[in-house]
Amino acid sequence: MQASAVSARRQSLEGLLTMFVMGGGLWGIGMAGAILMYGKTFPGSENFGYYVLNTLVMMAVALSLSYLIGLFVKNSNMLSGIANILSLGMCFLCGVFVPMNVMDRNVLKVSQFLPVYWYETVNETLGSYSHLTREAAVSVWKGIGLEAMFAMVFVCMILAVTRYQRQK
């Protein structure tokens, strides 16, 4: 596609857009499943909007990270293995499988450099409050903002890598 009239940057952005549209559809199905499973208690929760936004931003992080990995790995079996190792590793380090209050402080300090840590921090904060205090709301917005920054960094890395690969 390097001989195409469409610029490389536009091709990359359209690929990202396609991925986000497909991911958004799957996210919508997942949210509908959660609403069906929990009935009126979940959408009736005061924190429902925060939960929805948190999952949406985390989906953007996951999709952009997977796209970035896909730029480097061309074998689908290797891609699947790397994705499993990364996702399970982040889940173990960031408190998805093991509660954060049980984890060592040093592990938690390291996990702050991973997006799943902030996703879990927001979820734990939302789970602790039926009505968010001002401090809790600041903590939630900080976590969601950091997740969004991870997604933006990954997208910028995708654009830089694709540009480098096409110039090479």
Feature names for model-found ranges:
Residues Y50-S76, C91-C94, M149-I158:
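Hydrophobic alpha-helical transmembrane segments of polytopic membrane proteins
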Residues G127-S130, I144-K168:
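Junction motif at the cytosolic side of a transmembrane helix
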Residues M1-R9:
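Short helix-to-coil transition segments within interhelical loops
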